[in-house]
């Protein structure tokens, strides 16, 4: 993803901080992911050219920690707590997100809709 002067901006970078919800022994994030370098990118509904092997948000639980933090379906996860997520397997991404020792997850995501990103930032 790069920007060429004079061209419209098609994606923005967002920081999202999710405070995990404790349910018994579990810490809940409230979202699901898809993708990874070990997955078939042609099956990714969020990849524009069907070759992107990134990690994408595929579901956000209504009222859950991720929704409260502003995470959206289709967001591409670039970093988790400073760790690069651009070339990881699905399982590596899942493990990084669900580390028990981390009650807060700080994500760096790219979002395809500039209009949605601007609306979200105005609500915060």
UniProtKB/Swiss-Prot annotation:
Signal peptide: none annotated. One of its GO terms (biological process) is Rho protein signal transduction. Its main location: cytoplasm. GO terms for cellular component: actin cytoskeleton; cytoplasm; fibrillar center; nucleus; plasma membrane. The modification Phosphoserine is found at residue 61. The modification N-acetylserine is found at residue 2. It comes from the Eukaryota. GO terms for molecular function: beta-catenin binding. It is found in: Cytoplasm; Nucleus; Cell membrane. InterPro entries: PDZ (IPR001478), PDZ_sf (IPR036034), Synaptic_Scaffolding_LAP-MAGUK (IPR050614), Tax1-binding_p3 (IPR017268). The keyword Isomerase does not apply. Residues 15-112 form the PDZ domain. May regulate a number of protein-protein interactions by competing for PDZ domain binding sites. Binds CTNNB1 and may thereby act as an inhibitor of the Wnt signaling pathway. Competes with LIN7A for KCNJ4 binding, and thereby promotes KCNJ4 internalization. May play a role in the Rho signaling pathway. PANTHER family: DISCS LARGE, PDZ DOMAIN-CONTAINING PROTEIN. Interacts (via its PDZ domain) with GLS2. Interacts (via its PDZ domain) with RTKN (via the C-terminal region); this interaction facilitates Rho-mediated activation of the FOS serum response element (SRE). Interacts (via PDZ domain) with ARHGEF16. Interacts (via PDZ domain) with KCNJ4 (via C-terminus). Competes with LIN7A for KCNJ4 binding. Interacts (via its PDZ domain) with CTNNB1; this interaction inhibits the transcriptional activity of CTNNB1. Interacts with ADGRB2. This is Tax1-binding protein 3. It comes from Mus musculus.
